[in-house]
Amino acid sequence: MYNFNEAEYRTNLTRQIDTFGQGVELAKEITKDGYSNIFFIAVGGTVAMMMHFEEIAKQLTTIPVYAEQAGEIVLTGHRHLNRDSLIIMGSKSGDTKETVAAAKWIKDNYGCRIASMVISKESPLGRLTDYQLPLVVFKGVEYEYLSVFGLFYGLLHLHNDFPQINAFEEQLKKLPDLLVAAQAKFDAPAAKIAARYYQSPYLMWIGGGELWGEIYLFTMCILEEMQWMKTKSIKSSEFFHGTLELVDENTDVFLVKSVGAARALDDRVERFLNQYGKNVVIIDIKDYMGDIDDAFAPILAPVFSTAVLNGRLSKYFEKNTGHDLNMRRYYRQFDY
């Protein structure tokens, strides 16, 4: 596969999966001390990844779970935020300006406990963090999901909302094989898609349910930030209330189909696109998940989505555009 080190990928995934128990132990400590609700707070791709946990929480637990933009919450506050809230944050570098500012604001105003996905405990965010979530590598959104899984599903398990935690951990052990297989299966399609659409003046990306954060992340962080491509991300549930009017024979449209409860909305969009669109790409994440148990498929779907989209498609866009994924015009280049 193009630009893919399989041995390194397998090693890092295994190391990250092996930290699941550390997250569960943190969940035990936090549950023993008690908490009133959970706030996921970050910016950019990290808060996009966190949207998945908020969505799954609606379906599995009565624990109030919120995903908030760090730059907003310090200005608006939140009436459910209190001294007993558990804050889950993320900044791999540990110095994301808005996230660090939000952590300081939370500590100064509420004194909440903060669990952070951060590489260094000595970073600005790390120093404000009570519980450091294990993260073994800097790059790769799949590792971010895996970093949070132990803590989040440990908390739900201890709240009697996720009794199948041991079976879930066994499913995680399949991921090195299954994620490599998923990328191998999508490699040729990704090359073909990128060659066809890398010069598109406008790309519409549609998805929803447990994958909405993934659609938002891929369009904003990968295509816009890293490739300078003009995109629009739209929820399947909202597509028929505005965006459908932009579809014609010249519109380049991508639909990423989820595997959970919202899949019926994706099916409806697919039927419309097949009738009225000409340049349509359907990526069904279910096709790439192998023998993952149906009970855990919605939880793990974003991990597979990031493997095929970020892991394969972004690499081929980079190859065709000649625009290095690490090249930025503005982001972190100067103060703004």
Feature map (PLM): residue ranges:
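Phosphate-moiety recognition in structured ligand-binding domains
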Residues: Y2-A7, V269-Y336
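Active-site phosphate/pyrophosphate-binding segments
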Residues: Y2-N37, K139-G140, S147, G154-I234, ...
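Short amphipathic alpha-helix with an adjacent loop that forms part of the alpha/beta core around
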Residues: A27-T31, L75-N82, T243-D248
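Glycine-rich phosphate-binding loops that contact phosphosugars or nucleotide phosphates
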Residues: S36-Q171, V256-I283
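Short, surface-exposed amphipathic charged segments that create phosphate/polyanion-binding patches used
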Residues: L81-R83, S147-F152, V247-E249, D293-A301
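Glycine-rich, charge-decorated loop segments at or immediately adjacent to ligand/cofactor-binding or catalytic sites
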Residues: S120-L133, T243-L246, M289-I299
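Internal helical hairpin/lid segments
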Residues: G213-V281
